[in-house]
UniProtKB/Swiss-Prot annotation:
It is a multi-pass membrane protein. This is Cytochrome bc1 complex cytochrome b subunit. Its cofactor is heme. The lineage of its organism: Bacteria, Bacillati, Actinomycetota, Actinomycetes, Kitasatosporales. It holds the Pfam family Cytochrom_B_N_2. The gene is qcrB. Its EC number is 7.1.1.8. Gene3D superfamilies: Cytochrome Bc1 Complex, Chain C (1.20.810.10). Disulfide bonds: none annotated. Signal peptide: none annotated.
Length: 545
């Protein structure tokens, strides 16, 4: 009996090695059930969804190149005499950090290219994060249930900014040292504890002997570790919540229309990773960035002219450059408002985008889950707020480079500074009003297209001599896209008296919420969609085409 029972297994033969490994792993990790649940997960297809992937792939490139650079970088401020390959600096005294960075650039095989890739990838990572978050903001992808994922993305952006700052400060060149000096001045402006924080960070009086080693630990361990955890959590929530999608035929809040993870999306993502890596490598090979050998080592008594931080920190410098040099002297102490006030505004500018999802949820009272994205024009108030924030950001970027604007365009630096000061307050208001009006105009245009069709460019002469332009009807897909958005009613305070005729108390918070809700969904904030009756009347021949 045993011989007969074992005969089928002998005829089948031994399973392939890959299958045996998979069976072994499944018996211990349960990968079959995990793969079954996620490998056929559907991802919608839209170019804007690739922005998040640019961030992910740039982060991977940063880690890979960063590991290589750590093998040769010496995070020490000990003074050494340089005897490397770069002749103009031979015999100069400099820190080990600066000398090792020169060695990476000129003596390590491929070192300069890796340095450039690392720096360019960091810039592209932060630019991708910035644009990705703006896409999420303007399309309303932060709404329930994705508020936590929005905060994860916000923290990744902020931590990425500080990781980049600590990274380009490590070479201890004159430009990075100027940035460190800038940071030290901001820290010293903090009342009471500023001096203690500065001494702790630098290990004594600036520049001290410890900040490179401390920044090194923060740059390669602390911040990347936190960012990696946030990134994993961000991706897990993307899988858990399912991907958002733009409105279209067959698309609802309960489904996702697109391609499966395997094999289509995986193949596309793999190719896109190598495309991003290739583009960054080409840019790094032909465009020099941070040429520390041309700047020289840092000296506390020197400063670079035209010194600029990386673009993502430019708005913080703009805050300080345009702030008047006000001071308050009291009881033997000086409060430097010219630095301390910008130091307070800096986190507020960033926090404004972090808390916005919760503010909008409270104002609108909308507690439903949203998986269909908005077109920015259909949320004019939100879009106007976003453009106003961008206006503040870019105005401050101009302020951060006021000296370069002045020298390149032969302008008065004082005129630029005053322009930025005024635009900081006036610009967001003008941008808000203009953006909201543009969105409403686009809504009217969409309504007209639904009712009358698209202009064909064909001019027709009627029998009685009148000239008209022929309009072509939209496809069903286009009609669905232009009319699929929901239009909400503003929140109301309700009756002023209760059921007994007694005047009901209405809190100031309720009144504020009602007014803000009116600004979101009131008559002046959305154009009514065309009704079925209007559409039938036009398309049945009563309208004028």
């Amino acid at each position: 009996m045993s011989t007969a029972a074992n005969e089928p297994s002998r005829s089948r033969g031994k399973a392939p090695a890959g299958e045996r490994v998979a069976d072994w792993a499944d018996g211990r990790l349960g990968i079959y059930s995990l793969a079954k649940a996620n490998m056929r997960k559907i991802f919608p297809d839209h170019w804007s969804f690739m922005l998040g992937e640019v961030c992910l792939y740039s982060f991977i490139i940063i880690i890979l190149t960063g590991v290589y650079l750590t093998l040769f970088f010496h995070p020490s401020m000990a003074e050494v005499e340089y005897h490397g390959s770069y002749v103009p600096l031979q015999g100069q005294m400099m820190s080990e950090a600066y000398a090792s960075t020169l060695d990476i650039s000129f003596d390590v095989r491929g070192g300069l290219l890796i340095r450039q890739i690392h720096h360019w990838a960091a810039l592209i990572f932060l630019a991708g994060m910035f644009v990705h978050m703006m896409r999420v903001f303007f399309t309303g992808a932060f709404r329930k249930p994705r508020e936590v994922n929005w905060l994860f993305g916000f923290l990744l952006l902020v931590l990425g900014m500080f990781t980049g700052f600590t990274g380009y400060s490590l070479p201890d060149d004159l430009l990075s040292g100027t940035g460190i000096r800038f940071m030290e001045g901001a820290i010293l402006s903090v009342p009471i504890v500023g001096t203690y924080i500065s001494f702790f960070l630098f290990g004594g009086e600036f520049p001290g002997h410890d900040f490179v080693s401390r920044f090194y630990s923060i740059h390669i361990l602390l911040l990347p570790g936190i960012m990696l955890g946030l990134l994993v959590g961000h991706l897990i929530l993307v899988f858990y919540h399912k991907h958002t999608q733009f409105a279209g035929p067959g698309k609802t809040n309960k489904n996702v229309v697109g391609m499966p993870l395997l094999p289509v999306y995986t193949a596309k993502a793999g190719g896109f990773f190598f495309l991003v890596f290739g583009v960054i490598s080409v840019v790094s090979a032909i465009a020099t960035i941070n040429p520390i050998w041309a700047i020289g080592p840092y000296r506390p008594d020197q400063v670079s002219t035209g010194a600029q931080p990386d673009w993502y920190m430019g708005f913080s410098e703009g805050l300080i450059r345009v702030m008047p040099g006000w001071e308050i002297n009291a009881w033997g102490h000086t409060l430097v408002l010219g630095v301390f006030v910008p130091l307070l505004i800096f986190p507020l500018v960033l926090a404004a985008i972090a808390v916005y999802p919760f503010i909008e949820s409270w104002v609108t009272g909308d507690k439903r889950e949203h998986h269909i994205l908005d077109r920015p024009r259909n949320a004019p108030t939100r879009t106007a707020f976003g453009v106003a924030w961008l206006t503040v950001y870019f105005v401050l970027l101009i302020g951060g480079g006021n000296d370069l604007w002045a020298t390149h365009f032969h302008l008065s630096i004082n005129a630029i500074t005053w322009f930025v000061r005024i635009a900081f307050f006036v610009g967001p208001v003008v941008a808000f009003i203009a953006t909201k009006r543009i969105c409403l105009g686009l809504q009217r245009r969409d309504k007209d297209k639904v009712l009358h069709g698209r202009e064909s460019g064909i001019i027709k002469r009627l029998p009685h001599g009148e000239f008209i332009e022929v309009h072509e009807p939209l496809s069903q897909e286009q009609l669905h896209t232009l009319t699929a958005h929901e239009q909400y009613q503003p929140a109301e305070i309700g009756p002023t008296v209760d059921e007994n005729g007694v005047e009901r108390k209405v809190s100031g918070t309720q009144k504020l919420r009602a007014k803000l809700s009116e600004s979101y969904y009131g008559e002046e904030s959305q154009i009514p969609k065309p009704t079925v009756e209007e559409y039938k009347e036009i398309t049945s021949g009563h309208g004028h085409h």
